[in-house]
């Protein structure tokens, strides 16, 4: 496959990129600014770059492919992919964890040196599930501390890092889609209180935006009383990534899971933020069936009401530690 071949040109087990010509992009992850990938002292990373979140995407892809193979009756392929994902997770922890920042490195450079910088990329690692549970919780705790969390959302780079600039495109700004993926990661590790905190921050930010529509990004200044978030002058609005953010935050808060094989929609440890008392979801589809739901908040708990179903479909709440 591409992942295990051209995607890993030096065979170290990590997917990486390297600019092929001088006119190409120096950085080829979602943070593709020229200065987005750097070391703790501010030096730009050079050579083949293995981004932290990309390894998580590979891990998640192999686990999902293993599930597909098992459903298709290809058990040997399923076991192979599952084993590869497990080995990748072990290799990942050894190579990317940086005790000096109590988080995962932003990337490995061409010499396999970790970029020991606190960034939101580590938050996206939680979304993919590759992080060990104890380390995931430590990363999550950092994401909601003042170095990252402004009251409006989570910055792309912590405020005490060398290249931090709250007005930078990728080095200190707040990207709604980035926050949404982090929220899914928080939910994955059972941190629903943190999900609610992040949900409220972005909802509050949206109330200051034109048409209450979250833009591509906005500046990473700290929230102040009687002042809204500082807009990024050339941010796209509307923007596809950002437009999905409210739905993704709701997915994270409710713990929505879709099990097509069982014809079941599950709400895992659902929790609504304090500003949201009730949500009605219409035409929630699973295959050819659909359901309308009402979720009501009662303190830190929720009540679920099935308003209407079409076709064969089950809905359940799963409460787990």
Predicted regions, residues:
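Alpha-helical scaffold segments in carbohydrate-active enzymes
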Residues: 1-5, 57, 64-67, 80-98, ...
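Extended glycan-interaction surfaces of carbohydrate-active proteins
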Residues: 4-50, 90-174, 207-230, 247-248, ...
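Glycine- and acidic
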Residues: 43-46, 179-184, 230-234
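Aromatic- and histidine-enriched alpha-helix N-cap/loop-to-helix transition segments
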Residues: 49-60, 117-120, 170-181, 237-244
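Well-ordered alpha-helical scaffold segments within catalytic/enzyme domains
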Residues: 54-75, 124-135, 179-194, 248-257
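Beta-rich accessory regions
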Residues: 68-95, 99, 186-197, 262, ...
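Active-site-proximal binding-pocket segments
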Residues: 172-179, 189-198, 206-214
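Catalytic cores of secreted or luminal carbohydrate-active enzymes
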Residues: 235-280
């Amino acid at each position: 496959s591409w992942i295990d071949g051209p995607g890993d040109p030096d065979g170290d087990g990590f997917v990486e990129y390297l600019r092929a010509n001088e006119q190409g992009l120096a950085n080829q992850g979602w943070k593709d600014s020229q200065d987005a990938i750097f070391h703790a002292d501010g030096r730009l990373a050079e050579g083949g770059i293995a981004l932290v979140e990309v390894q998580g995407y590979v891990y998640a892809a192999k686990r999902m492919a293993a599930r597909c193979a098992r459903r298709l009756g290809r058990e040997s392929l399923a076991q192979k992919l599952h084993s590869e994902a497990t080995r990748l997770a072990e290799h990942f922890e050894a190579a990317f964890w940086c005790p000096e920042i109590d988080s995962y490195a932003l990337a490995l450079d061409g010499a396999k040196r970790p970029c020991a910088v606190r960034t939101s990329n580590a938050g996206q690692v939680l979304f993919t599930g590759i992080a060990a549970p104890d380390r995931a919780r430590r990363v999550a705790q950092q994401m909601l501390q003042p170095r990252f969390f402004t009251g409006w959302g989570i910055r792309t780079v912590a405020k005490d890092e060398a290249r931090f600039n709250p007005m930078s495109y990728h080095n200190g700004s707040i990207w709604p889609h980035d926050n949404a993926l982090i929220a899914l990661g928080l939910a994955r590790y059972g941190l629903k209180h943190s999900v609610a905190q992040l949900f409220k921050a972005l909802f509050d930010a949206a109330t200051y935006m034109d048409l209450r529509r979250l833009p591509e990004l906005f500046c990473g200044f700290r929230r102040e009383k009687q002042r809204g978030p500082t807009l990024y002058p050339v941010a796209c609005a509307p923007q596809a990534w950002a437009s999905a953010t409210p739905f993704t935050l709701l997915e994270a808060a409710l713990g929505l899971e879709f099990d097509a094989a069982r014809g079941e929609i599950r709400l895992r440890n659902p929790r609504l933020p304090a500003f949201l008392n009730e949500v009605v979801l219409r035409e929630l589809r699973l295959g050819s069936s659909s359901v309308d739901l009402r979720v009501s908040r009662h303190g830190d708990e929720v009540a679920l009401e099935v308003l209407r179903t079409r076709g064969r479909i089950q809905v359940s709440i799963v409460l787990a530690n």
